[in-house]
Each structure stands twice: as C-alpha cells, then as structure tokens.
C-alpha cells in the first residue's frame, strides 16, 4: 500500500521517487503535492474478526469502489496491443492521485510481504499464465494476450478493490472461452451471496461450474473482506462444500476473485517475491 514520505526532505533529488515509477525524485514528484498518509490499518490486526459495516462505512466503501470502477473503465478505453504494463501503472497512479485518493498496492506489505519486499507499483498486472500479483514493468502487450488488472484505491480511509480481465486483439477460441467461463464462475458465486448463507456456497458454485468444463480452481489465493482494511476476514474460497464456512450477514463486504486455470491449479512465486504463475504454464 502506498505511503508517500512525510516531506520531500526525506529524499534527495537523485533518489528513486517514492511513487514507484522508477524515475528519480527530481524528475517525478519533487515539488508536487504528496498523497495523504495511508491509514494505519492496511492489514487486519485481527484477521479472523469479521467486520460488519455501519451505514457510514458502507457509504465510504461505495465511494472508493466507484473510483476503482472508474479507473478500470479508463483502462478499458486505453488498453491495446503496444501498451506496456508500466503505462497501465502510470495511468492508474496519476489518476488516483488526481482524484485525491491513494493507490493501495504501492508499498503494500512493507516488512511483511514475501521476502520482506513491499509491492513496488500502484496496480497488479497479470498476463497469460500469471495468476495474480504481477508487477508492472516494460513488458508490451501483444495481440493474443489476456491480462487481469487489479486496482485498489483508498478514498477517505476506505478501500475499494476490484479487477477486470482484458482480451488483447484476437485470441484462440479456447482462451476466450476460459475468460468467458471465469466470468460465469464469478456470476454464479455472486448469486450465492445472501444473509444467512455460508461462504462455502460461493466456493461450491464456482468450483462446480469450473470443473464441469475441465478447468481447475486455484486454491492458493482467495477473496477476502475489504473496506475498512485492505484484507479482512472472511476468506472467500473459490471451492468448497455447501453449508460450510462463515455465515454471511447483512452489511458484510467482501471480494469474490475466482482464479481458474486450463491446467493444474497449483501456483509458484517468481523471484520478485510477488508474481504468482501457474506451475505448468497453462
């Protein structure tokens, strides 16, 4: 998650900019308004405590979620072959700051993330065999790619988290079908959300549809509560048994993020400590 320096005096002109752009401070944010400090509760201090939101909190989460949606709409208007994932990061970063918000992924996990490395960018960009948490770089999108862009912003202390899949140009029929059926998995999961239901109902609906088509469900990552903190309880597994898991209650807020593979469900983490890819390249 992102936090700018308390003041520009913390960085010299030739230091890398705090924003993660890779540019020197003098060429980037020197003399420009810094973002507001991020909330302290970016990671749940009690990961099993499910937060039932108040009406005030729900309105704050709606506001941050609307900005997240708008950022994804902006990407949809601009993304195409020839664009780099760093460009996507720059679009999101600059527009988030312009709106007075904070890009939550930037510097998220400082001292707690994989190998102690904070996430260095403002958005996750996951291409093809990358399951999630891909780090933007100079890779250029080409015809036939599929990419998931995961955006989380903080507005007035509240978190809005969403991702969207994009198809670049013409892709094989099997690839397009995977994207379409993963969307269907999401819709089937959402259809199970109701007060009095169990989170296992969501996972079961997703798993049943995916496996009926010969796909596998990633088990190493899941959806999660969100809103007051970046990651809250409950965990929303994308597989499961009906009638099991946590009780869904009115005013809970959580993400459903089905990750569906053509091949095996297992993942591995690349050397950057964040990027999760399929073990078989599918």
Where are the predicted features?
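A generic local structural motif
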Residues: 3-5, 241-242
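Short cysteine-rich clusters marking metal-coordination/redox-active sites
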Residues: 17
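Active-site neighborhoods and metal-handling regions in enzymes and metal-associated proteins
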Residues: 13, 21-282
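Short, flexible, mixed-charge glycine/proline-rich loop motifs
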Residues: 6-12
């Amino acid at each position: 998650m992102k936090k700018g320096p308390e003041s520009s005096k913390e960085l010299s002109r030739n230091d890398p900019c705090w924003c993660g752009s890779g540019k020197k401070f003098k060429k980037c944010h020197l003399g420009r308004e810094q973002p507001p400090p991020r909330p302290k509760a970016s990671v749940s201090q009690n990961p099993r405590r499910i937060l039932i939101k108040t009406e005030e909190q729900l309105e704050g989460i709606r506001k941050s979620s609307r900005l997240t949606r708008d950022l994804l709409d902006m990407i949809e208007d601009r993304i195409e072959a020839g664009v780099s994932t760093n460009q996507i990061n720059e679009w999101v970063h600059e527009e988030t700051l312009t709106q007075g918000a904070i890009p939550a992924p930037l510097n998220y996990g400082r001292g707690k993330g994989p190998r102690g490395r904070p996430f260095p960018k403002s958005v996750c960009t996951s291409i093809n065999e990358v399951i999630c948490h891909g780090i933007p770089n100079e890779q250029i999108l080409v015809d036939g790619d599929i990419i998931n862009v995961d955006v989380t912003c903080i507005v007035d202390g509240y978190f809005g988290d969403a991702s969207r899949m994009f198809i670049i140009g013409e892709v094989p029929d099997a690839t397009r079908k995977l994207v379409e059926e993963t969307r269907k998995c999401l819709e089937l999961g959402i259809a199970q959300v109701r007060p009095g239901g169990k989170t296992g109902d969501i996972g079961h609906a997703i798993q049943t549809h995916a496996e009926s088509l010969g796909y596998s469900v990633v088990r190493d990552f899941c959806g999660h509560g969100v809103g007051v903190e970046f990651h809250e309880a409950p965990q929303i597994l994308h597989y499961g048994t009906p009638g099991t898991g946590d009780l869904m209650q009115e005013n809970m807020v959580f993400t459903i993020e089905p990750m569906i593979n053509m091949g095996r469900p297992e993942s591995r983490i690349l050397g950057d400590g964040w990027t999760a890819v399929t073990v078989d390249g599918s």
